[in-house]
Regions:
Chain A
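H-loop/switch region of ABC-family ATPase nucleotide-binding domains
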Residues: 195-196
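Catalytic Walker B motif of ABC-type/P-loop ATPase nucleotide-binding domains
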Residues: 160-163
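Conserved ABC ATPase "signature" region
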Residues: 113-131
Length: 221, 245
């Protein structure tokens, strides 16, 4: 498998807090589903935010798609790695579902017809076509998560980080999410699923990374 | 520090005097004078000038830009600067620009003066001034939500950038479009917060009893009365002097 994200000696401490991520070394590859698990407060979300560049590590290096993370701006990282927040509300901006996918593409200069075609395809894939005129904030949690994923995939990232994607989903929706993750992995997109739902991770991840008090205690690679 | 002990009600009176003066007075020198007085008052209240400039750097730049734009678009008989015979800056325009900047600066400084008091104490001050509890409570709530909305705004900025949008590279026309997208979730989230708070308040029987007991009770000291009387008298004298010139 092709290595896409490489973390070497990453450490991070929150100001005025005893919690810290300590000496994180790992390689995340395209085409694999990695489950990042651990107790509440073990550092899973912090690790995801460091990979995305939302938080800057105190020490260590991150290489993304062969480029040193220090040389990548937030928007450049966003084009390489898609990130779905724990709370989907934070990633919804537009007045309707279709526009949620189209507007970043248009702002970045994509032709309107092409952007619309892309949005239609993604809405179809995520079973959101019938909701295309609805206000994103008024959707159910599961629908919001699917919309966030669709909008993220519209950027064509090489890797996806999903923070607690199964939260609030019923059994059928979890199954659908798993199938989607498998499909994406087959297409060559890497996935890191941050979750404390060990059962979900154990059933669906190719590799499990377990964090405890900010340290990797198990990397099943 | 005595400044820290000053009652929030005294600060309200001071701020009312400053903002009223700056709106009533038209003479340029006197307007600038009020600007200087407001900064002096902020310093006396323990505000760090450098930290203040650093904190409000962007707003100050915005205020300055607005003032320059106003200067340019205000016509007047005495032209100070022109390009190919087209007057760009007139004496009246310059005066208007300076006055606009100082007026907005005084409003900003007034906010800073009020922020030197704990917001709970400010609200308590209003309650003791017989402002209806419901209105005072709503004001307190809105102040409490400012940091939450700031955090949400910052999260939205990050989330937009993670969509591959580079704020620095997008053209001006599209930038305004971006701000609409940024503001939309904040408006929707504030409506959601309001709805949730209303339900929580109803469920805790807010306003069920007419009388309330207070844990925090503010008492005006001698120097509070001194500052209030001095502020009112000096303001009246200042406005009178400005109108007489």
């Amino acid at each position: 498998m092709e290595s896409y994200i490489k973390l070497t000696g990453i450490s991070y401490g929150y100001p005025r807090s005893r919690f810290a991520l300590r000496d994180i070394n790992m390689s995340l590859n395209r085409g694999e589903i990695v489950g990042i698990t651990g107790e509440n407060g073990s550092g899973k979300t912090t690790l995801g935010k460091i990979i995305m560049g939302i938080l800057m590590p105190d020490s260590g290096n991150i290489v993304i798609d062969g480029v040193d993370g220090k040389n990548l701006k937030l928007c450049e990282r966003g084009s390489k790695i898609g990130y779905a927040f724990q709370n989907p509300d934070r990633q919804l901006f537009a007045a309707n579902v279709r526009d949620e996918i189209i507007f970043p593409l248009e702002i970045k200069g994509m032709n309107k017809t092409l952007a619309q075609e892309k949005a239609a395809a993604l809405l179809g894939r995520f079973e959101l076509s019938h909701l295309k005129e609805r206000v994103p904030m008024r959707l159910s949690r599961g629908e919001k998560q699917r919309l966030v994923l669709a909008a993220t995939l519209a950027q064509e990232p090489g890797f996806l980080i999903l923070d607690e994607p199964a939260t609030g989903l019923d059994r059928d929706r979890k199954k659908a999410l798993y199938q989607l993750m498998e499909e994406l992995a087959r297409e060559g997109i890497g996935l890191a699923v941050i979750s404390h739902d060990l059962q979900f991770i154990e059933h669906h991840a190719n590799r499990i990374i377990r964090l405890e008090n900010g340290k990797v205690v198990d990397d099943g690679c | 520090m005595m400044a820290a002990k000053i009652d929030p009600r005294t600060k309200i009176v001071l701020v009312l005097c400053l903002t009223s003066m700056v709106l009533v007075v038209e003479n340029l020198a006197f307007v600038v004078g009020i600007g200087i007085i407001s900064i002096a008052c902020a310093l006396l209240m323990g505000v760090q000038l450098l930290a203040l400039i650093r904190r409000y750097q962007r707003i100050l730049i915005l205020l300055l830009t607005l003032s320059i734009v106003q200067s340019i678009f205000t016509p007047g008989p005495k032209v100070l600067f022109e390009v190919f015979g087209i007057p760009l800056l007139t004496e009246k325009g310059l005066e208007m620009g300076i006055k606009t900047f100082v007026r907005m600066l005084v409003i900003l400084t007034s906010g800073v003066i009020m922020s030197t008091s704990n917001y709970r104490e400010t609200i308590q001050g209003l309650i003791q001034w017989k402002v209806p509890y419901k209105i005072a409570f709503m004001t307190a709530l809105s102040l409490r939500f400012i940091p939450i909305f700031t955090e949400e705004f910052q999260d939205s900025m990050v989330a937009l950038q993670l969509k591959g949008i580079d704020f620095k590279k997008i053209p001006f026309g599209k930038k305004t479009q971006i701000y609409v997208y940024l503001i939309t979730p904040i408006i929707l989230s504030s409506l959601k917060h309001a709805e949730e708070i209303a339900i929580a308040m109803e469920s805790r029987a807010f306003g069920a009893y007419q009388s309330r007991v207070e844990y925090l009770v503010l008492r005006l000291k001698g120097y509070d009365y001194g500052v209030m009387i001095a502020a009112v008298l000096l303001s009246i004298s200042y406005v009178w002097a400005a109108l007489m010139v």
